[in-house]
Amino acid sequence: MIAVENNRSDKNYKALKENLKILSKSYDENGKKLKIIKIPMPSPVVIDKTRVPASYLNFFISNKTVLVPVFNVKEDKKVLKIFRKFFTKREVIAIDCSDLIWGFGAIHCMTQQEPKI
């Protein structure tokens, strides 16, 4: 899965396009081309005049589910459809991260491992 920005005037467009270009030329350890699943970026999410790093790729996979952040924007439904097509053996659950993203992270960030001290 790779994030893609369709709005050419968006500040992320160029970098994400370059990422896609690099990945498109990449192969796995067996010399096979990678299967690339494009995930559109959500429309910009702005809180208190600050654009926050909303991304659907901040998802979490568990044994039976996939928790996907959503942001109450037009792209949410399309992205959930893509996830459901890809993760056919897991329940895809949308989690509203509209407020959570203000902390500059979402589901995947919250579930990171804590090292034992």
Model-found features: residue ranges?
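Histidine/cysteine-enriched polar flanking segments
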Residues: 1-117
